[in-house]
A protein has these predicted regions:
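Short, T/G/N/S-enriched strand-turn elements that build extracellular solenoid repeat scaffolds
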Residues: 26-29, 46-53, 171-177
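Conserved small/polar residues in nucleotide/adenosyl-binding loops
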Residues: 211-216
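All-beta strand scaffolds that present successive hydrophobic residues in beta-strands
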Residues: 58-61, 116-119, 158-161, 181-184, ...
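Acidic Gly/Asp/Thr-rich repetitive segments characteristic of extracellular carbohydrate-active
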Residues: 5-39
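Acidic/polar low-complexity surface segments
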Residues: 68-101, 124-149, 185-199
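N-terminal extracellular ligand-recognition/capping segment immediately after the signal peptide
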Residues: 9, 34-83, 93-103, 122-123, ...
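Right-handed parallel beta-helix
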Residues: 27-30, 104-107, 124-174
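Extracellular beta-strand solenoids
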Residues: 39, 52, 60, 68, ...
């Protein structure tokens, strides 16, 4: 079954924060046993944090853009340094300079299964609102909070296909403790002057298959 976010109140006008409408569609899809949450082409959906849930395919049609909000208050905050992970020994983020996991998240999932992000649309992290000091050659990356584009914890049977991921202010695809992962045919296009906008970071994951994907980013493709 298809759950079109426009039918759940999303505007797709590039201005309105559509997070609540998108989340409503995701919740309805998961609660009904699963299906496809659709973002139609020709629309820009501005959004704060969204939570992907079990048995949901999050599908962006060609020409659809999910773009991070300009306002930090639209992103849900996690407690820095608080144990949040399930069934993972020591995630890499525990050793990061910011002393814990990312405090803010854009596209997030935790303790879920059968999650997919698909389609030829685009997810844009709106990097410019997170810039530190900008010089001729470099943009300071040692400032927080910054928002990773995709942050997925303890997700089993995870698929990411075809989508373009761009404008990430921090790690683009951070997978923590995920199992049975397929990443295929995606494009990652980030600012080569912005520090720490890694491409794909499998962190304590198992059975990951990554292929036929392109990444242009400043660090750790």
């Amino acid at each position: 079954m298809i759950y079109d976010v426009l039918e759940y109140g999303a505007k797709g006008d590039g201005v309105t924060n559509d997070a609540a409408a998108i989340q409503k569609a995701i919740d309805a899809c998961s609660q009904a046993g699963g299906g496809k949450v659709l973002l139609q082409g020709g629309h820009v959906f501005r959004s704060g944090t969204i939570f992907l849930k079990s048995n949901v395919e999050f599908h962006l049609e060609m020409g659809a853009v999910l773009k991070a909000s300009d306002h930090l208050e639209d992103f849900d905050m996690l407690k820095v340094g608080t144990p949040q992970i399930s069934k993972v020994d020591t995630p890499t983020y525990n050793a990061c300079d910011y002393n814990g996991k990312p405090t803010l998240n854009f596209v997030y999932s935790k303790d879920a299964e059968n999650v997919a992000i698909t389609g030829f649309g685009k997810i844009d992290g709106n990097e410019k609102i997170f810039y530190g000091k900008v010089t001729k050659w470099h943009i300071d990356g040692y400032f927080y909070p910054r928002v990773p584009l995709l942050f997925l914890e303890n997700v089993r049977h995870l698929t990411i296909q075809q989508v373009t991921l761009t404008g990430s202010a921090f790690w683009t695809t951070h997978l923590v403790g995920c199992k049975e992962v397929l990443i295929e045919g995606i494009r990652i296009i980030n600012n080569l002057r912005l520090a720490n906008c890694d491409g794909i970071d499998p962190d304590h994951c198992s059975n990951c298959l990554l292929y036929t994907s392109d990444a242009a980013d400043e660090e750790d493709s």
